[in-house]
Amino acid sequence: MVTSLFKSLGPVRGVNFHQTQPMFVSGGDDHLIKVWNYKAKKCMFTLQGHLDYVRTVEFHWELPWIVSCSDDQTVRIWNW
């Protein structure tokens, strides 16, 4: 293991690494989406809005968007 980062209030269900930045996004059972800087080893910001488990998170390959899918039956596009 290289490092470990903890801030989730439940299991993490989805993780996606940014293609060019030292970042990844995570989503899970706490209904939150967190954007992490893995070089700084800290959570940069948290996105709130889903009403149930976040199952999938992904950075858009070109635009400053994060797409998330939740058990609340919504797909959300976040402008970060």
Where are these regions (language model features)?
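Structural WD40 beta-propeller signal
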Residues: 18-20, 60-62
